Amino acid sequence: MIDSARRVLATALSAVLLLGTLAGCANGSGTTQNAKSTDGAATSETTASAIKRGESHDPSIVKANGKYYIFGSHRAWLKSDDLINWTPFTNNLSTDYEKIFSGIWDGWAKQSSNPDVKGNMWAPDVMWNKDMKKWCMYMSINGANYRSVIVLLTADDIEGDWTYVGPVVYSGFEKVNAAKTDVWKVLGEGADLTRYASQTDTGINAIDPCVKTDDNGDIWMTFGSWFGGMWMFKLDPKTGLRDYGTTYQTVPNQSDAYYGVKLGGGFGNSGEGSYLLHTNGYWYLFASYGNLQQTGGYQIRMFRSDKITGPYVDEAGNTAVSTRAIGNNWQSDIGIRLMSSIQWSGNDNANIEVAQGHNSALVDDDGTVYLVYHTRFSGTGEKHEVRVHELLPTDDGWLVAAPYEYTGTKAADTKYTSKDVTGDYELVTHEQNTSFKGPKKVNEKNSTDYRGVNKPVSITLNDDGTVGGDKTGTWKLDKSDGTGDVTITLGDVTYHGAFDKLPRDKDGKDVMTFSALGGNVCVWGSQK
């Protein structure tokens, strides 16, 4: 998202969350209204579903000691026993952040246009470092004009307390202030820094870290920002900081001597919140396009590679790395869009998900893969909550998101026959050029006649393998391994995906669904 918009929204969210904390203390039930605690985290339990919701912007998921933990922007910490119900928790970062970050904030990121650290602790990622025998938290400390830094903190317990270690990577530097960073250490004293002011080259914001270990045991950190692309370099496993022994060449659209390997984006195109996941024989790169606001078009795009360093491509072979400016690239066909704003019978259409993004993902102990993201809603302005969907593998090596929220039913729990899945379905296509824009009539605030949402057509999966209805074609259930793998051909596009019987978001009714990918576009089906 645009940096200034993010700062303004962060300030507003902090104020709202603070008020929510006071309100939560006054109401002990937490059932029909938000019961908020901690600065940045909140939960609410709805009477309809009895799910204890969690609020955490830019949620990063990690599992430890049999529990699931989310670490988000603005010190929004959540934990869960089941990936469904979330409880906030606190540590020293919740209250002592000004003292903990005073050195790096005052010495680098603080500026007159951005004087308060409170709304500028963004998108942490947490991992266990087996060499250090510590939990390592990588957090963005955001400054104006891209003068930001990603720092490392460590803890013996994943819930904290946390100890500040030091900076990992800087942005927004120039010759007059480079001595405050590690730039001369990496590039050599007096190196030419001209290209670091260019958004078409390497003028990035050092935000949104993601830290992963590859098959060789090497630790890599991805990071980066909207305009200037997403990058990665190797970390030293003994310190958790940058590995200064590994160097990189400066090659346009491929790598940079300071920022390392280029993974995606650049040339002023949106692309942030990079997240890597290794499963199914591939490395998958997730990135968020668009602006994070309710009507900003925020969305998750996916690419994959055989190697952690890329190159990452989508199903059509488009590279994640931009080589030119693309106006409103969140409306482009580059990258697989996992989900969009939709209206169908399985949703509460007065409050549909919008601006879904900044995800993380988890391969659980049993091999189930989950997508974790924040979403806003059509009827609640900039309020956001965490959502979790299962990610299903396709027979051609991609991942697709299950159509409904994970509430305890796993796709792997049941094998399906043709008799189980034939019937009438609503079919939604996650068009890449659509995004929620509010009611068609702006003055009708409660209208559900929205602009920029995807609506279903009707199809029938017949028992003879044909598809009838608004779209026609053929379908086939793979019975060779007893899984729910499906191939559907509609027109000249063949989709590969999986069936999954799930409770609908709207009312909990169990229905057969499918999620599939073809022609670089995802589709969802939900039985009527």
Language-model segments: which ranges?
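C-terminal motif of bacterial Sec signal peptides marking the signal peptidase cleavage site
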Residues: 20-24
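Bacterial N-terminal signal peptides that target proteins for export
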Residues: 1-12
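Carbohydrate-active catalytic/glycan-binding domains of CAZyme proteins
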Residues: 27-528
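Enrichment for repetitive, rod-forming helical segments
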Residues: 13-14, 344
